[in-house]
A protein has these predicted regions:
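Switch/coupling sub-region of P-loop NTPases
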Residues: 3-123, 133-134
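Conserved P-loop NTPase
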Residues: 122-144
Length: 144
């Protein structure tokens, strides 16, 4: 986030507020995975509602939290909405495994997607930055 221009409008979408965004023009949307959350501003808001809200805000950058079975289809839709800077995280052993994990998560909400077409589209649209941690040190080991 430090690499983004300080004047950019940044929107974050997380299930737990963890990201620290230095840009003053920012909006944090927190959607809890737990019913009865203390976050009254987004209580009852679905992932699809959040995606619609984010599109209306017209951010310069969208930073999602961790991709999960619940939010993957919505995040994929958002990544295809024409916003240039969209980032999220997913746990995987390799870049190819990250693509596969993303598709598996999308299929939880959208089981009838064309897997081959979606995989090709992901390879065309997404860059995977693989980060490995060794103790307290993190390093980039691959960029696709």
């Amino acid at each position: 986030m430090q690499l983004l221009d300080i004047h950019k409008r940044v929107v974050t979408l997380e299930d737990t507020r963890e990201l620290k965004v230095p840009q003053p023009n920012r909006v944090h949307i927190v959607l809890s995975r737990v019913k009865g959350s203390k976050n009254k501003d987004t209580e009852g808001m679905s992932d699809a509602d959040a995606i619609d809200l984010i599109k209306r805000i017209t951010p310069d950058a969208i930073i999602g939290g961790e991709i999960s079975n619940k939010n993957a289809a919505a995040i994929w839709a958002l990544m295809g909405s024409g916003h240039d800077n969209c980032m999220a995280t997913i746990h995987a052993e390799s870049p190819e495994a990250a693509y596969e994990a993303f598709i598996k998560c999308i299929m939880e909400q959208s089981p009838h997607i064309n897997v081959e077409k979606t995989m090709q589209e992901m390879h065309r649209k997404l860059h995977v930055v693989q980060i490995v941690r060794d103790g307290n040190i993190r390093g980039i080991t691959c960029i696709t």
